[in-house]
Every structure is written in C-alpha cells, then in structure tokens.
UniProtKB/Swiss-Prot annotation:
It comes from Bos taurus. It catalyses: a very long-chain fatty acyl-CoA + a sphingoid base = an N-(very-long-chain fatty acyl)-sphingoid base + CoA + H(+); docosanoyl-CoA + sphinganine = N-docosanoylsphinganine + CoA + H(+); tetracosanoyl-CoA + sphinganine = N-tetracosanoylsphinganine + CoA + H(+); hexacosanoyl-CoA + sphinganine = N-hexacosanoylsphinganine + CoA + H(+). Its EC number is 2.3.1.24, 2.3.1.297. This is Ceramide synthase 2. Ceramide synthase activity is inhibited by sphingosine-1-phosphate.
C-alpha cells in the first residue's frame, strides 16, 4: 500500500507537463537538475540554524541590546495563590466579573486584589523586552543577508529582466550552485522558524504565522522538485526585500528609538505594499498563471503551485491591512507599534506603580517603554 501511495504521489502527470517524465530531469552531460532528494539536507541544516541562533542571541544580540540601552520594565510578580493559579491554568487568564466575585470569596481577597493578581500573572507570562529584541535581531540578520545574497543570485539572470524567460525550456532547466544553496538555506531557515514557533514570541497573528511558514515550506519544496526554480528565486528575493526592514524597526522600537523606528516603518510599509501587493500579483503571479499555458496544457502541479501562491497573497493582504492601520496611527500622531504585539498591562494602583520604579508613572507602556507621542520623543 505504501508503495502504491508513493508511486501515485510521484506520478509524472501530477507534477510535470504532458509527455515529460522524471527521467528527463536526470543529470546528464554535466548538467545538474533539481531533485526531491536534495531537500533532505534542509532538516539537519534547520537544526544547525537553531544552534547558530542560540549563540547569536547570546553573544551578539544580547550585547547589542545593552549597547542600545534596551531596558526591562520591573515586573511585580503575582504572589502565590493556589486558588487563583488553578483558575488561571484551567479556566482562563481573563476572568469575567462573576468569576472575580467567586474567586474573591474563595481566596479571601477583594475583587480589586483578584483583578490585580491576574494582571500581574498575565504579565509574568509575557515575553521580556530582551527576548523580543534578540528574536528581532536574529531575523533581521538573516533576512538582510538573504536579501543581499538572493539579489546577487538573480540579478545577472535574463529572466530577472524578462519574465517570459522564466519558462524558456521548462522543465528541462539545469541549476547552478548558487541557486542550490539559496534554496537550501531559505528552506532550512523556514523549517527552523516552524520548529521554534512554540517558544518564540507569540503575537496576535500566531495562526497566520503558522499558515505562512507551512505554505512557504510547501511552495519552496514543490518549486524545487518540480523545477520551478527560476520563479522560486524571484519570489524568495521579493519576500526578503521588506522583512529585514520590519525587524530593524522592531529592534529600534524595543530600544526606545521612536523616531528611527517610525521612519524605518514608513520605508517598510512602502516597500511591502509595492512588492507584495503590486509586483507579486501583477508581475510574478501573472508570470506563473499566464505564461506557462502558452507552452503546455495546465496540469495538477500548475494548479497546486498557483493555489499556494494565492494563500500567500491572502496573507499579504491581511498583513497589509495591519500595516495600514499602524501607518494611520502614525499619521494621526500616535506612535507606531506592532499591531500583532501582546501589550503588557499596567498596574492601576499608584502605589504599585511607584514601587515598580515609577519614572513612567501614570503613563501608558508599550513593549516595556513609556509611549512617547509625536510631540515628545526620545531623541535618536
């Protein structure tokens, strides 16, 4: 049965145009073609990425955070309380008013004390500012290097300037070492993101992030073994062109450099809109939807690839909506911050705020820093 499933999955009619077989993509005459077995290396490489990330965050990102004066807000810990802890772990982190009244009677605390305990307990579970900074630093470093390397891989190729050449001779298109390593490294990195997503900072778009990582892994993998490599390199470079800007904006936001953060964010928003909502759908998707049909009849692989591209495009539209919301806040005089962030709650008691080192007393906090409006910002 397993052999039958294997044979059906790798049936040429699913993944290749009519009258072509996998034998046509076997290495010959010094020409090397993409093969599914090439992708096996990406799993150990993903584990290597996790190891490199650990040491990068420890020996590069942490000193950089200190250099940029990334400071933690002192958090008041919730005192031990078995009754409230049991409710927090089993019933929810946001008790309703009726729950607060019941817990007040069970614990012998006032309703206000119960609410304060849950605020502190939720804050304990939120990631620290240093953790956020280190994570953003790692992603910034990778995306910047990947964008530079990816651009170097494609900038001298004829299909970079004429998209019809993406399909010239398809699928009998040999690959070169730079394409191989670009693919393996990108795919390995996204595997590492998927492996670490449970321990990384969780944002409001957590489910969308999982969908994005899975869709990206499927797209990169399929485009490799079906030899959509030329289109794949264009798509990966296009995606990397804006991601490093977002991560750098986050880094400066966590460091409290609001002017720098806002300026980089505006650049990111422009690049994101142009690349994800203009170039990708009207050039790249047009290239993958229209041009192949001029060469051969549509087949399953054609539909599958473009369906997954459609999934990514829907995510781009969703994220563009969040970006435009943040841009609107910036234009209307509110500090830009990541709409996906899980914001830390503040204590309502003045005495507690003072005990926490209330230099930011009576001022709202975002990411552990007092929010600075456009009329009073930290100088860059």
């Amino acid at each position: 049965m397993l052999q039958t499933l294997h044979d059906y999955f790798w049936w040429e009619r699913l993944w290749l145009p009519v009258n072509l077989t996998w034998a046509d993509l076997e290495d010959r005459d010094g020409r090397v073609y993409a093969k599914a077995s090439d992708l096996y290396i990406t799993l150990p490489l993903a584990l290597l990425f996790l190891i490199i990330r650990y040491f990068f965050e420890l020996y590069v990102a942490t000193p950089l955070a200190a250099l940029l004066n990334v400071k933690e807000k002192t958090r008041l810990r919730a005192p031990p309380n078995p009754t409230l802890e049991h409710f927090y772990m089993t019933s929810g982190k946001q008790p309703k008013q009726a729950d607060v009244e019941l817990l007040s009677r069970q614990s012998g605390l006032s309703g206000r004390q119960v609410e304060r305990w849950f605020r502190r307990r939720r804050n304990q579970d939120r990631p620290s500012l240093l953790k956020k900074f280190r994570e953003a630093s790692w992603r910034f470093t990778f995306y910047l290097i990947a964008f530079i390397a990816g651009t170097a891989v494609i900038v001298d190729k004829p299909w970079f300037y004429d998209l019809r050449k993406v399909w010239e001779g398809y699928p009998i298109q040999s690959i070169i070492p730079s394409q191989y390593w670009y693919y393996m490294i990108e795919l390995s990195f996204y595997w590492s993101l998927l492996f670490s997503i449970a321990s990384d900072v969780k944002r409001k778009d957590f489910k969308e992030q999982i969908i994005h990582h899975v869709a990206t892994i499927i797209l990169i993998s399929f485009s490799w073994f079906a030899n959509y490599v030329r289109a794949g390199t264009l798509i990966m470079a296009l995606h990397d062109s804006s991601d490093y800007l977002l991560e750098s904006a986050k880094m400066f936001n966590y460091a409290g450099w609001k002017n720098t953060c806002n300026n980089i964010f505006i650049v990111f928003a422009i690049v994101f809109i142009i690349t994800r909502l203009v170039i990708l759908p009207f050039w790249i998707l047009h290239c993958t939807l229209v041009y192949p049909l001029e060469l051969y009849p549509a087949f399953f692989g054609y539909y599958f690839f473009n369906f997954m591209m459609g999934v990514l495009q829907l995510l781009h539209i969703f994220w563009a909506y969040l970006i435009l919301r943040m841009a609107h806040k910036f234009i209307t005089g509110k500090v830009v911050e990541d709409e996906r962030s899980d914001r830390e709650e503040t204590e309502s008691s003045e005495g507690e705020e003072a005990a926490a080192g209330g230099g930011a007393k009576n001022r709202p906090l975002a990411n552990g820093h007092p929010i600075l409006n456009n009329n009073h910002r930290k100088n860059d």
